[in-house]
A protein has these predicted regions:
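Conserved N-terminal phosphate-binding loop of PLP-dependent enzymes in the Aspartate aminotransferase
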Residues: 1-199
């Protein structure tokens, strides 16, 4: 089972729409991925209308994960995916302490935490990643756009060592991660990414 968040955006592919919380993105499609649920969103204009930076109210909304754990059982939840800053729903920063609390709960229940950093990684927030900016370490980071300075399409997935080691130890094929696309690892995209990182 995967847990997304209401108002979350993770692209318009089948999986991204399923875990994303954008109702209008799902309304033109039939059934989505099974086993997906959503945390409540953190946008509260009434309480946070004049907040500067991270909103003061709403960190407790991370505890909505406890409701989903009670509903589904933690052993059935593989991961929670959120954007450090909700991009397509208004560039909304999380409430103070929200991401740290989400990290604590994922650790407590042995659930992976994924940050979708397509928008926030590679200097967009003055740090290498949004996770570094907020001082929260997820288990997986998905990133794109800024990795090549948006000059050529490329994306990447960054994982904690324990995930990488698990993939290497349990590979049942000559390819460690049997997943990819026709243009994955394109040399020009990789060169653009390396040049961007050098800058």
């Amino acid at each position: 089972r995967l847990i997304g968040r209401e108002r979350g955006y993770h692209g318009v592919g089948f999986g991204g729409i399923s875990v994303g919380g954008m109702v209008k993105n799902r309304m033109y499609f039939g059934s989505m991925l099974n086993g997906v649920d959503h945390l409540r969103h953190t946008h509260n204009l009434k309480l946070n209308a004049f907040s500067k930076g991270e909103p003061e109210h709403g960190a407790e909304l991370a505890d909505d994960l406890e409701r989903l754990v009670q509903l589904h059982d933690a052993s059935t939840i593989a991961a929670v995916i959120v954007e450090p800053i909700a991009g397509s729903t208004g560039a909304l920063p999380p409430p103070k302490g929200y991401l740290k609390r989400l990290r604590e709960l994922c650790t407590k229940h042995d659930i992976l935490l994924i940050f979708d950093e397509v928008v926030t990684a590679f200097g967009r927030m003055g740090k290498a990643t949004g996770s570094e900016f907020f001082g929260v370490t997820p288990d997986i980071i998905s990133c794109a756009k800024g990795i090549t300075n948006a000059t050529i399409p490329m994306g990447a997935t960054i994982v904690q060592d324990f995930i990488y080691e698990s993939m290497m130890e349990n590979a049942d094929a000559p390819i460690e991660l049997f997943h990819g696309y026709t243009y994955s690892g394109h040399p020009v995209a990789c060169a653009a990414a390396l040049a961007t990182l050098d800058i």
